[in-house]
UniProtKB/Swiss-Prot annotation:
Organism: Xenopus tropicalis (Western clawed frog)
Active site: 246, 259, 261
E.C. no: 3.1.-.-
Record flagged with keyword Cytoplasm: no
Gene: mgme1
Keyword field: DNA damage, DNA repair, Exonuclease, Hydrolase, Mitochondrion, Nuclease
Name assigned to this protein: Mitochondrial genome maintenance exonuclease 1
Alphabetical list of PANTHER family matching this protein: MITOCHONDRIAL GENOME MAINTENANCE EXONUCLEASE 1
């Protein structure tokens, strides 16, 4: 018999003997695997701290189903990133700031006459230039203070509107547009003054462009009586600021500072009037601390008139609401003074 055939028969005999004795098979395979494993190269996983990750390995291998349940995900996130820090909800608003130099809206030291004894032949009309001359131009106006302390968000939307209008109308067209708005507003105030004074009412020709605004406020005028002042300057003697008040009169039996506004868009809510409530509060405080006025005011009224003649929106401010906006005004006034001081230091 050839040597190759002998080797083949010998191998078959060994396999048959092994299969007949199955008890030796695991040992044979284990021994073979052990021998083979000795030939493998060094593995980097041997250096891993297995005790550190023992719990994680046990968790993954202990179950045959997927461990990615909601509870398991929360546990893993907590292990990897730590505990969740809950942010403040939208309803948690910061406490309102209090003015450092708080001055009351009303003047406790001012002796006010009853309304029936404060009637004049003509309403008060103190010119603003005379006040500026008296103060040598060093006292800021309410309008200036509000403009220079305008919130960033409000300034952003105002600038965006301006740029949009410039894109549509051009620089010159936008200038003409704003000039026309100013002219219409001025005509509207002049004719309102005539109507409130009842001078040549119904005989005077209405200026073109203002008839729509006048029609818009007709239902408001029927509730206004006892005009005390028209286009009159006010000066807060303690806080040192100036303003020009459109009107002080009784509205539904409440003495109010009345501010007439024109708008091309509806403004049904007081928040739509932006800083106008602060302006009203500033004027009320100034009147109460101005000796030229022998009365005090604690209410306000914003009237928004529309060019198309649709009924004007009225926003009445009672005493509590006036106090609310008075505090906001005091904060804006403090901000203005702080900015002014910083600017003077840099010069």
């Amino acid at each position: 018999m050839k040597p190759l055939q002998q080797i083949h028969l010998t191998c078959r005999r060994i396999i048959r003997d092994v299969l007949q004795h199955k008890s030796f098979l695991p040992a044979f395979i284990s021994t073979s695997c052990t021998c083979l494993s000795r030939k493998k190269k060094h593995n980097g996983y041997d250096e891993v701290n297995q005790a550190k990750y023992e719990g994680l390995v046990r968790t993954v291998t202990a179950s045959r189903i997927s461990p990615q349940t909601p509870d398991r995900l929360f546990e893993e996130d907590n292990f990897l990133f730590g505990k969740v820090v809950k942010s403040k909800t939208a309803t948690q608003t910061p406490e309102p700031k209090a003015p450092q130099n708080w001055v009351p809206l009303s003047n406790p030291n001012k002796v006010s006459l009853p309304l029936e004894k404060t009637d004049f032949d003509l309403p008060l009309k103190i010119s603003l230039p005379a006040r500026n001359h008296m103060a040598n131009g060093t006292i800021p106006s309410v309008t200036r203070i509000l403009q220079q302390t305008m919130p960033m968000e409000q300034a952003f939307y105002l600038e965006r509107w301006k740029q949009r209008m410039i894109m549509e109308l051009g620089e010159q067209g936008f200038a003409e547009y704003t000039a026309a708005l100013f002219s219409q507003g001025k005509q509207f105030h002049m004719q309102l003054e005539d109507l409130l004074l009842a001078l040549d009412h119904g005989k005077k020709e209405e200026p073109e462009g203002s008839t729509g605004y006048l029609s818009s406020v007709q239902h408001v005028l029927t509730d206004i009586i006892g005009v005390k002042s028209l286009e009159s300057a006010v000066h807060h003697s303690e806080l040192q600021y100036l303003g020009l008040v459109d009107c002080v009169a009784e509205y539904r039996q409440k003495l109010c500072v009345i501010d007439w506004k024109t708008s091309e868009k509806p403004k049904p809510y007081i928040r739509d009037t932006f800083d106008n409530p602060l302006q009203i509060a500033a004027y009320i405080g100034a009147i109460n601390h101005d000796n030229n006025y022998n009365f005090q005011v604690n209410c306000g009224l914003i009237v928004v008139a529309y060019k198309d003649g649709s009924p004007a929106h009225t926003h009445f401010m009672d005493t509590d609401l006036c106090l609310h906006f008075w505090n906001k005004w005091l904060l804006r006034l403090e901000e203005y003074k702080k900015k002014k001081e910083e600017k003077e230091k840099q010069q």
